[in-house]
Amino acid sequence: MRIARFVVDADPLYGVVEEQKVHTLAGDPFFQGIKPTGQSHELEDVRLVAPIIPRSKVVAFGRTYRKHAEELGNEVPPEPIMFLKPNTSVVGHNEPVTLPSFSDEVSFEGELAVVIGRICKDVPVEKVPEVIFGYTAANDLTARDAQRSDLQWARAKGFDGSCPLGPWIETELDNPDDIGIVTRVNGEVKQDGSTSELIWSVHELVARASEAFTLLPGDVILTGTPAGVGEVREGDRVEVDVEEIGSLGNIFRR
């Protein structure tokens, strides 16, 4: 099932996407379940927004793909690197991203994101499927120059618009550990990888995040990016295509 968040006239609504229609839901599916209102819209007549604005946090992992660590000249860490992105970093499909004034070197990072569905802490790996609401595509934008110069990654990873998510949440994947991720810049393929290349499985990463933090409904976990990252420039359109989910696209401006 695909759960979208969209705007028709005013406030954002949730809906179930089926083919070229979106069927409106009553309230918030994270807390009130899937309750159709009976109203539907053509998908082309609505504006998709970020499928979730995390109420609490985005937990992100770095250097979870060996080849990506190597392309940046980094060693593979014994434990995955964990950091946070604020909810103000989240934007949706087709929303423009303003490049930060403090950086001249912003990179794209196409990723699979996990959306949490219930309050949880210290979740064993085998229990992780019980706390997952679904999955979406993500672009973990990174100001590389700030990442190198700053002692912490807060500015480099957390600037406004640095976490595009979308286009919707897919509640079921056949196998989260075998999902293709393709990132294109202006139509040219830059990343072509798979979660099968992850050093730690998707469920292991969720379990590790729950060891560090209490996870809340709507929290998002970014699982890391495969090799092929590169810079994005003003006017570029970056598309992250995640198998079984769809394509997340954003245009960049100054």
Where are the model-predicted features located?
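Short helix/loop capping segments that flank catalytic or ligand/cofactor-binding pockets
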Residues: 69, 93, 123-125, 145-146
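Catalytic-pocket segment enriched in acidic/His residues
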Residues: 51, 68, 76, 144-254
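N-terminal non-catalytic cap/leader segment that marks the start of a structured domain
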Residues: 1-80, 172, 176, 182-184, ...
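Structural signature of FAD isoalloxazine-binding scaffolds in flavoprotein oxidoreductases
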Residues: 76-93, 108, 239-244
